[in-house]
């Protein structure tokens, strides 16, 4: 299902009550101006449910758009992809932290990107492959539109899933640090 709103394109969405204290709502943002992405997962009773995966648009009036995107759910944890010191996107991290400081009980955590390796292109390719594997696992592959630029939503989804798997002390091979050039061929 694809839902369109003025500031985001939702790839996968499902309704949820605003307050469910027995579950943990995890939100992960892949930061960027042109192609930011958000994934929202609900972890409840040792199961994971995908609530939302969205491509966002923060290219203009970014404060209003980010505030709107942050206000859609009541998160328990917000994961932000760590940015280099002089990155122009650091302002988004500070804005999100400041916005949630007094308005939410959510923990805000800056995390390193999930994939590591030799080249940017290889990391993005592995991220998309892992994302599509997870979509198969969740039975949501048909909901993912065919498009070339899936790496942003893949990165946000992988941030959230790595966080969940780390909490469960579960190892997932594609998320392991790998320096081999032939990693993709070995999968």
UniProtKB/Swiss-Prot annotation:
Membrane topology label: Lipid-anchor
Post-translational modifications: Acylated by palmitic acid group(s).
Cofactors that this protein relies on: Mg(2+)
Broad class of enzyme this protein falls into: hydrolase
UniProt KW keywords: DNA damage, DNA recombination, DNA repair, Hydrolase, Lipoprotein, Magnesium, Membrane, Nuclease, Palmitate
Pfam families in the record: Pox_A22
InterPro entries, per database record: HJ-resolvase_A22, RNaseH-like_sf
GO cellular component annotations of the record: membrane
Subcellular location, record wording: Membrane
Domain of life (superkingdom): Viruses
Secretion signal, residue range per the UniProt entry: none
EC number from the UniProt entry: 3.1.-.-
Cofactor note: Binds 1 Mg(2+) ion per subunit.
GO molecular function, one term: magnesium ion binding
GO biological process: DNA recombination; DNA repair
Stated family: Belongs to the RuvC family. Poxviruses-type subfamily.
Purpose of the protein: Nuclease that specifically cleaves and resolves four-way DNA Holliday junctions into linear duplex products.
Protein name: Holliday junction resolvase
Organism: Vaccinia virus (strain Ankara)
